């Protein structure tokens, strides 16, 4: 989720963009050989997107009307993998998580700021059919991962993985009217023009005793954004480097608690993005500048076996 001040200079690009997914992934595994295990799973996902922006820039009250988009859908995907153990101290894993295609539906509501210009424009836009049901199709990318784990001693284990995510499945994110006077017409196109992206990670586990394990890691995560002219205010992403530390507590054979902390160095992201494909003929203007920021990420996971 990303939020801006309501009246920031790029408000006709976005004021708020929020995407949430819920994934339920039942899976089965089969030990085909003493050195080879296979796994397969189905993924049911629930996706929701909320998107707010000004109607546009320029004269005529467009900066006095907000458009609020709300879309959702259910979708299915699958995942599979194998684990090969060439020796008692080495494991090699291959896995793939499929692309998931959403056919999202919802609506757009228009709101005036209460000014005379805003109220007049709102009445005109509603009368012309711009407040309506919406539909959009988007494919979330598939990911392929190769991983290796090597036991160096009774206490130390080295880890590494490389993954490729098919972000090029998202070229344009088109939102279309699906009811009323504008049925079948384009409401907005969000130009993404993503590329496939790589992630490379290395790590180590240190077994302090039978109950406690310490974890260390570093990762390089490539952005799918190609250049400043295709970087979106909805996703001002750039390349990242992760430094992480964690611990695992295993009080008994059936319980496990993992805690992790990561600091993410994000490369400064320049943007020079112009939006001209808004339906009423007024453009969204150009946003030009630079995003700066780093992240702290805290995670916790508890596992219970039965």
Please name every model-derived segment.
Residues 1-306:
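Outer-membrane beta-barrel porins/channels
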